[in-house]
């Protein structure tokens, strides 16, 4: 359901009261999210970012943290970079737009979702 409110010609009243889990909402009031939303809208003709834009933003920082931890150098082979990054990702802990994230031994991202309800055509965070 994330992003449904931004679908062209979608009647947002049809989503009224829908509850969903998503790690990000452009209506979040924290400073980091609002700075991201403003920069995204400025760069994308006022398009509002959804969870997937925020996930993409966060993953770049996670990859940078892993590359730094793995001490990646330009002279390393692709195979060596891949092995070093895979190992380093297990130690990365990121506090990003989509929340606090870490990675499991099998490479899955582990983070807490946030609960939202659609009210008056907007995502409202639930307690």
For every predicted segment, state its role:
Residues 1-127:
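Extracytosolic ligand-binding ectodomains
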């Amino acid at each position: 359901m994330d992003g449904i409110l931004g679908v062209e010609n979608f009647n947002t009243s049809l989503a009224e009261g829908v509850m969903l889990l998503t790690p990000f909402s452009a209506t979040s009031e924290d400073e980091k999210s609002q700075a991201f939303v403003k920069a995204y809208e400025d760069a994308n003709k006022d398009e509002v970012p959804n969870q997937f834009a925020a996930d993409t933003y966060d993953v770049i920082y996670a990859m940078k943290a892993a590359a730094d931890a793995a001490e990646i150098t330009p002279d390393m082979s692709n195979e060596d970079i891949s092995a070093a990054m895979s190992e380093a990702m297990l130690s990365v802990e990121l506090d990003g737009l989509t929340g606090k994230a870490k990675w499991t031994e099998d490479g899955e991202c582990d983070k807490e979702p946030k609960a939202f309800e659609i009210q008056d055509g907007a995502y409202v965070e639930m307690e």
